[in-house]
Each structure stands twice: as structure tokens, then as C-alpha cells.
Amino acid sequence: MNKSTSIGKLVKKALIDHKQNDMNSALINIMPAIDSTANKEYGGGVGHRIRSFIRKNEALISIIALGCFVILPKFRYPGKTKSVDFADIIYDNIRTYIVHEGEVGEMIEFNHEKKLAISLTKWSLNENYVLAFILCVIVSDKNANEFIAEDVIINLNFGCFSVNDLWGRRLDLLHHIANNSNGQYRVENSNIVLN
């Protein structure tokens, strides 16, 4: 195969945007791929399926973005009637804003450092969160038949990977991370957990 598939094209554009430090454009390109992937995995309404996809991948996202395992608790913002979690914040302030406004919501900003900073009015995510979202699309088992022309190598803390070698290999990536974590993580029930 030498032509990119439809999800492959979105992934390739998002990777190029990420490399050029254009996180807004990277997210504009990857969010439809997240939705399509989540639809294959969960079906149902768009909010449910995207939140479910992010929740399932939250540990992997944090390891890629921060270099460590972080699952954020639910919390309540002033004026909100229910508690929210990481998936709610991403859906409400990235996906929904992109669809309705064409850009990421003001609550989200990106930094070049390996950190996550949260306040009542601002979430500062490092740029590797965007790369993590892209990788979650790539490794979904529902995307095993995807492909990008002119393969890309992704450098992560735990290795270098060809995008075309990663399609649909979520479990393999989780095992690779666990096996290279000096005993910090293990794979359990198709997810990565702390030892």
C-alpha cells in the first residue's frame, strides 16, 4: 500500500502540525480521527464515545505526555452542577470548541515543558498531550488496517516507533512501556496500571 487511508491522512496532517508546533491545527486534524475511531470502538452519541475513548486511554496519554502515570480525579468547578474529569475537560474545551469555533477553547493552553498545570480557569498541557491523542488513534485495534504514505518515526521516552508499524497495536505498545518501566507498570485488563 502506498496511499494514505482516510484516518491515515488526518494522522499525517496532525503529526506535521505537531512537529511545526501548531497544536490548534494538529487538534483540528486529529479530533475527527478520534471521533471516527471512538465510533468504531463504542458507537452511540459523540460525547459518550469520545469521552469513553479518552478515559480508556488516559493512562497511556499521561505516560506519553508527562513521562509518568497520572489519572486525574473528578473535581467540581464553581458554577457546575456535576463533577468533571479529564475526558470531560478535553471534550468540552477542545473537541466542542473545534467543531463550533474552529479552535481550541480559551481554557486550554499548551506549553513546551513536560508539565500539566490546572487552575479553575486554565489548563496548561504540554504539547505531548497532542502527540498522545494522535498515538491513541494510531494504536487503536480498530485502526489496524490504516496506513500513511511516507512513514513517520515518532520518538518517545520509551523508544522510537514507525507509525505504520504501530497501527492497531495498542496492547503491544502497552507491553513495551511496561517492559521498559523498571517495574513501575504492568498491563492488566488491556490497560497499563501501576505495580
Predicted regions located by residue number:
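Long, charged low-complexity segments
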Residues: 58-129, 135-167
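Charged alpha-helical initiation segments
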Residues: 1-27
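Hydrophobic/aromatic-lined pockets within catalytic cores
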Residues: 19, 35-42, 99, 103
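Sequence termini and other peripheral, non-core segments
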Residues: 157-195
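Hydrophobic core segments within long, regular secondary-structure runs in both alpha-
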Residues: 8-11, 51, 92, 96
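Short, contiguous, well-structured surface segments enriched in hydrophobic/aromatic residues
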Residues: 28-71
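Short runs of predominantly hydrophobic/aromatic residues within well-ordered alpha helices
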Residues: 7, 23-30, 34, 87-91, ...
